[in-house]
UniProtKB/Swiss-Prot annotation:
Keywords per UniProt: Membrane, Mitochondrion, Mitochondrion inner membrane, Transit peptide
Chain segment of the transit peptide: 1-80
Protein name according to UniProt: Coenzyme Q-binding protein COQ10 homolog A, mitochondrial
Similarity-based family: Belongs to the COQ10 family.
One GO biological process term: cellular respiration
PANTHER family assigned: COENZYME Q-BINDING PROTEIN COQ10 HOMOLOG A, MITOCHONDRIAL, SPERM PROTEIN HOMOLOG
Record lineage: Eukaryota, Metazoa, Chordata, Craniata, Vertebrata
Amino acid sequence: MAASTATRFSGLGARSFSDFVGLATFQGLRGCRSRAHRHPIRHLASCGIVMTRTSKRAVQDIGSPCIQQCRSFLSFTGPLTNKRKEYSERRIMGYSMQEMYEVVSNVEEYKLFVPWCKKSTVISKRTGYAKAQLEVGFPPILERYTSILTLVRPHLVKAVCTDGRLFNHLESIWRFSPGIPGYPRTCTVDFSISFEFRSLLHSQLATVFFDEVVKQMVAAFERRAGKIYGPETPIPRELMYHEIHQT
């Protein structure tokens, strides 16, 4: 009888996607060998838990094919593609252009309210320009990257990722324009983001989390504006506008 073995993540700290993907894939393949016979023990590759006990029968049939029964943290059932993804959202908000610009351009406070943003530090700043370092967390993984911001008060905030192991391309653009005529404390917010991960494995793993971050982004900034500037201007339902595009 095989000796009991248990491996766990302890003191994870900041792991890169490369480290985690490699470990998850290895554990998934290892767990594949024993799941064909549906033993009571479950092998959770995504949690980093290796099999605790293997019966003699499982050892004897270790070479048996188990393609259909295997499940790993990453799914390879479909073709691996790493195309650039784009998301855009337009909506009317009950805050002024200046108010929304101030919230979006204040990168230093992103860590307080932006989904999965663990750290945000402005390294340098001058009129119309800022350089910031951000740390994004997809539990239990943390990735750091540098972002260059172009600032045009109160119309534009553009951020471009210049380094980092996670993204081959990452660009976000916020545009603020006048809102509803007769409602001075309203504005039209156009948010767009495009991103492409450096590797296919990163793309397969991170898309699960990153898509959700993108979808929550505008709402997170709207809530932040409410916390700073108070209730938004009431907008009649027939004048409200909200449009989303995703590719």
